[in-house]
């Protein structure tokens, strides 16, 4: 049973989006909510419609005491692996907050080791901790927008549809057109595509 840490005024929630895709950055967000300005309907971003996510993202940015995004690029993911890159991107999001929190709640079961702030990992935190839900929404909206931009650059890959995840469609496009500079070379399907071209 999750309980909020006692004795801390400013608590940030942190989450990441984009561990599974074959392309682009892993994107994180850190959010400190305002207890006097609650937001209705916060939930795990994966369980919300796109329309609801966009509306909530605007409300979070408006009402939160502080929010920030972090990222680790595809080449960093290839260099240090996706887990380490996710943790690095989480640290970057926290360090970018305009107000530094007194405590950080991190989605999942690992805490970035270089946070320098007391922290706790919360499994399924994006469903049970409002701050982490808010972070998951901001990260998902930001990453989806990046995939839509990439889709405009490379329409033949259909990134707006699959958002870079290894769907049947994405794997077909990868086999047909090869890997882009934005693809994660350490991921098996990309490696395979690079060998074929």
Curated annotation (Swiss-Prot):
**What reaction does this catalyse?**
Endonucleolytic cleavage to 5'-phosphomonoester
Reported cofactor(s)? Mn(2+); Mg(2+)
Q: Name one GO cellular component term.
A: cytoplasm
Give the organism the record lists: Haemophilus influenzae (strain PittGG)
- Database matches in InterPro entries: RNase_HII, RNase_HII/HIII, RNase_HII/HIII_dom, RNaseH-like_sf, RNaseH_sf
Disulphide-bonded residues:
none
The lineage is: Bacteria, Pseudomonadati, Pseudomonadota, Gammaproteobacteria, Pasteurellales
Query: Domain of life of the organism in this record?
Result: Bacteria
CDD domains with a match to the protein in the record: RNase_HII_bacteria_HII_like
| Keyword Cell membrane annotated | no
Q: What is this protein called?
A: Ribonuclease HII
Q: Which Pfam families match?
A: RNase_HII
């Amino acid at each position: 049973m999750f309980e909020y840490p006692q004795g801390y005024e400013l608590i940030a929630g942190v989450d990441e989006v984009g561990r599974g895709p074959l392309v682009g950055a892993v994107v994180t967000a850190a959010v400190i909510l305002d207890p006097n300005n609650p937001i209705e309907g916060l939930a795990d971003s994966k369980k919300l419609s796109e329309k609801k996510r966009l509306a909530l993202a605007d409300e979070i940015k408006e009402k939160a005491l502080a929010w920030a995004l972090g990222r680790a690029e595809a080449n960093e993911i290839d260099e240090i692996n996706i887990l380490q890159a996710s943790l690095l991107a989480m640290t970057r999001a926290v360090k970018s907050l305009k107000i530094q929190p007194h405590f950080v709640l991190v989605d999942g079961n690992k805490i970035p080791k270089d946070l320098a702030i007391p922290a706790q990992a919360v499994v399924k935190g994006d469903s049970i901790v409002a701050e982490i839900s808010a972070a998951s929404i901001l990260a998902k909206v930001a990453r989806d927008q990046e995939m839509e931009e990439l889709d405009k650059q490379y329409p033949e890959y259909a990134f707006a549809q699959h958002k870079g995840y290894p769907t049947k469609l994405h794997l077909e496009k990868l086999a047909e057109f090869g890997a882009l500079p934005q693809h994660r070379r350490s991921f098996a399907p990309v490696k395979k595509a690079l060998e074929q071209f």
